[in-house]
């Protein structure tokens, strides 16, 4: 489960009133303006944001397979279990925003041609862990580690919430923000470059 500190509200230059709509169970919605601004802080122009849907209900909802605390993004769209679905993640806690960025990483992977579903599906024990090494590039990490790296970059560098990083070993490391920037260097220079996609599956 996700137990995060409070303190959300991604600051954008747009003055947008909160959307009063409520997405029904099993329904979907587009990204909000705040969510797009939040995602752009990591993925820049490397995504077609208009194509992204956020579902209230898991991808495996009707099969009973999905854990109630797990979101999945197998096809370029995000599926959050009901209790974790939000109408606008940019207005939620910084921790929830980080989770959103993790799932957006899988959207980015999918849109650039990575076979998210077929690669992740048969590997239920794929590691989310990562170690920041000057000799490793973003493409040297598997798809879930990439998700955590983007999430931690957002938390530590964009939001200044290093204490919430997924990789607990870096939460008090003063070098963590710079290490993240170094690992993401090629990605941040061109988020549309498919050479940044995972080259490993372990």
Label every model-predicted segment:
Residues 1-27, 190-202:
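Low-complexity, glycine/serine/proline-rich disordered segments
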Residues 19, 55, 80-81:
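C-terminal low-complexity, largely alpha-helical membrane/lipid-association modules
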Residues 19, 31-36, 40-41, 47, ...:
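Metalloprotease/metallohydrolase-associated module, dominated by Zn2+-dependent proteases
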Residues 26-77:
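Auxiliary, metal-adjacent structural segments of Zn-dependent hydrolase domains
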Residues 39, 76, 100-102, 106, ...:
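Generic structural signal for small/hydrophobic residues in well-ordered secondary structure
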Residues 45, 63-67, 79-101, 137-139:
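Short pre-active-site segment immediately N-terminal to the catalytic Zn-binding motif
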Residues 79, 109, 149-151:
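Structural recognition of the beta-strand scaffold that forms the well-ordered cores
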Residues 103-122:
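Catalytic Zn2+-binding segment of zinc metalloproteases
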